[in-house]
Amino acid sequence: MSTGSTLNQRSGKPVKLRASCDFCALSKVKCDRGQPQCVRCIKSGIDCNYSESRRIGKAWHHCAPSAVRSTSATTQGTRRKQQTIAQHSPRRRIHRDTQALSAADDAMSPYDPSGYATPFSMFHTLPSPVPESTIRSQTHIESYPSLDGTMAPILCSPESADISLPDIPHVAQLRTNELEGESPSVLQYNPSWDRIMAEHSTAIGDAGDCITRAAAVLKSVRDPRTSCVRSRTPPRSHTQSLDATLDDGRTAMDTVKDILACPCAQEIRVALLLVLIIQQVLESYQALLTQQHDTPREESPLGINLSRYDTPMAIGRYLLDNELRSKIIVQVLSSELEKIGLILDILTRHAQSMAHQPDELILGTYIDSLQTTKKEVLESLEQGNDI
C-alpha cells in the first residue's frame, strides 16, 4: 500500500524537463531553450528532445541509502504482520497465505526496477532491435544490489547519468555495435565517447536535409515556360503574375539565407545548389523587366511599364495610380536585388574557404557572373526610373 501510494504521488507531480535539450547537451553548446524545439535542432534538421530533469546527475536510488533502509524496515514490519496473521489462521489457508507473502515480498522489494520513477533502461533509449531484457543484461549495472545494503556501481561516463541520447543515426549505430560486443564490466568507461563527441561537434548539420530543401526551392522557382522532354506537364505559355514572381523570389531567398546559417553550406554541393536558386530568381526578375520593355512607352510615363500587371495597390482608401504603382514596384525590386547582393557576398566568402576543394573555381566563377547579372538588373531599374 505504501509503495503504491508513493508511486501515485510521484506520478502525479508535473515532469520537470532539463534546461538544455539532449542535442545541445551532447554537442556541449549553449541551448536557447526553445519549446518545443530549439533553433539549433531546427537548423540541424533533427528532432529536439528535452529529457526529464533530476536534481543530481545519478539515479535517485543510488543516492538515497536512507530511503532504502526505511523501505527495508517497512518491508520487514509488513512481513512480521503477515506471519502473525498466518499463525492464527486455519491450517487449510497456510499454503495460500504463504503464496501471498511471497508475492508481497516481490512487490515490496526496494530493488524492483518497476517501482522507480525512471527505469534502468533510461540510459539506453536509442532504437535497437534487441529486446529490453537483453539490453539490461548488457548495461553498465551488472546486477541488482543485494540485501546487505551494497549499492550498484555508479555509471561512469563523460556526461551526467540522466542524459538520454537523441536519435542521431551514426551515434546510435556506433553505440549499439559497441554494446553487443562488450561486457558490462568493460562499459564503465568507453574511450569511444571522446571520438563520438568530437565527430558530432564538428558535423552538426545534415547535408541531406539542406540538399532536400534546396532542391525543393529550386524546383519551385524554375521557369515554368521551359519544360523537359521527359516531363508530362506541358510548359506554360502565359507570363507569371507580378505578385507571384515577387513572392516566390522572396521565399526562395529566405530559404537560401537559412541554409547559409547551417554548416552544410560549407559543402560544395550545397553551395552550387544555392547558386542555382539565386540564378533562377534573378532570371525571373530579368524576364519581368524584359517583357515590360517590349510594351509601348506611351502606356506609362516610365520607360519600364510595370503597371501592365493589374495588381491593385492602395493606402487605405487611397488608390495608387499607374505612375505611383510603377515607382513602388521598382523600389520593391531594388530592395530584393540588394538582399540578393548580400547573400552573394556571403557565398563569396564561403567559396574562398573552399580553396582546397576541386570545384571551388567553378563556384567562384558562377558567383561572379551572378554579381554581374544583379548589377545589370539594378542599372535597368534605375534607368527606367529616371525616364
UniProtKB/Swiss-Prot annotation:
It comes from the Eukaryota. One of its GO terms (molecular function) is DNA-binding transcription factor activity, RNA polymerase II-specific. One of its GO terms (biological process) is aflatoxin biosynthetic process. The keyword Endoplasmic reticulum does not apply. One of its GO terms (cellular component) is nucleus. PANTHER family: MONODICTYPHENONE CLUSTER TRANSCRIPTION FACTOR-RELATED, OLEATE-ACTIVATED TRANSCRIPTION FACTOR 1-RELATED. Transcription factor; part of the gene cluster that mediates the biosynthesis of a methylated derivative of known natural products orthosporin and diaporthin. Positively regultaes the expression of the non-reducing polyketide synthase aoiG and the O-methyltransferase aoiO. This is Zn(2)-C6 fungal-type trascription factor aoiH. It comes from Aspergillus oryzae (strain ATCC 42149 / RIB 40) (Yellow koji mold). The lineage of its organism: Eukaryota, Fungi, Dikarya, Ascomycota, Pezizomycotina.
